[in-house]
Regions:
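Sequence-structural signature of mature extracellular/luminal beta-sheet repeat domains
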Residues: 1-202
Length: 202
């Protein structure tokens, strides 16, 4: 869907995130979206298990769909570094049987970086359900939400000069709130002042 001032909401793209190329589908559509400086729409696609690029003229291509020859789980959210690299989370939510799905090829849930040329790097595999992702204004810290009811946290990772991540730390935890209120850590954004706006139980 899209929203335009004076016009409101209208259909933008259908299908979105699932072309039927992969025979399954739980939460099959696109999830995280971002618009890059060139006006291209990048999408984390649960259904087709990839990061895609939609060009202003309507053309579309895959930026990343595997790591070392194994299909990604179901990319969930993404953010752009000023270098042009895309950082994204890859939980199992798009797979019908989640972590136990027979189509799952990776034995972990990762946070990845993909360069404009399509080179994919695993940044961390320590998170069980990585979800929302965003940089601090100076790009020295990467924040990642974890939507695991048994460990509902936000992590903060230092970003090294080469774009990889240092040892992360737990920024906040709301596990005690899970079950008492609806919701989990999910999407997040960081404003220009460095404030983190995040979904949570509530």
């Amino acid at each position: 869907m899209k929203w335009k001032e004076g016009e409101g909401i209208s259909l933008f793209l259908k299908p979105s995130g699932y072309t039927g190329a992969v025979p399954y589908g739980k939460e099959p559509g696109s999830n995280g979206l971002l618009m890059d400086p060139e006006g291209r729409l990048l999408s984390a696609e649960h259904g087709d298990r990839r990061i895609s690029i939609l060009y202003p003229d309507g053309g579309k291509r895959t930026l990343a769909d595997n790591y070392q020859g194994k299909r990604l789980n179901s990319p969930n959210d993404l953010t752009r570094h000023s270098s042009g690299a895309i950082y994204f989370t890859d939980p199992p939510y798009g797979l019908p049987n989640n972590v136990n799905d027979p189509r799952k090829e990776l034995d972990f849930q990762g946070v990845f970086r993909v360069t404009p040329g399509g080179a994919v790097t695993l940044l961390t595999r320590e998170m069980t359900r990585p979800n929302g992702i965003a940089f601090s204004p100076d790009e020295k810290t990467l924040y990642v939400a974890q939507s695991d009811p048994e460990k509902a946290i936000w992590m903060a990772f230092p970003v090294k000069d080469d774009g990889t991540l240092g040892q992360g730390k737990v920024l906040a935890e709301v596990t005690a709130m899970v079950g008492k209120m609806k919701g989990l850590p999910d999407g997040l954004k960081v404003d220009r002042a460095g404030n983190i706006w995040a979904t949570a139980p509530g």
